[in-house]
Amino acid sequence: FTFNNPLKNFYFKYIKRQNPYSEIAVNDLLMKFKENIKIIKGDTNKILKELNLQNIEYIFIDGGHNYNTVKNDLFYSKKFISENGIILCDDYDLSYAPGVKQAIDEFVKENNCKFELILDRFAKIEL
């Protein structure tokens, strides 16, 4: 079940006059939660190994769609996540990017994680 809010589309098209998925719109939304969110922008294959993060309770991955990138993202997420943390991955079962599903399935199996598919799109991984 997917809910589409027509008021959201009207608001962004005629009042805000911006794409609701643009970087500006997303940053405006996330600023409401700035005490709890840290946005890190860049190529995860390069920046994740440079970060010093720990005890992150929730990680949302919406990144590259190739196998090696997803493996890298999950490898570092495991290092950063707290005990009983949750990793949510977007685009789990894309027909044109089978490496995403393969990397996630391998990670879940290798790390004995709980797995839940949400809305046929998101992979919820509990460590």
Task: Name what the model sees in each region.
Residues 1-127:
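S-adenosylmethionine/decaboxylated-SAM
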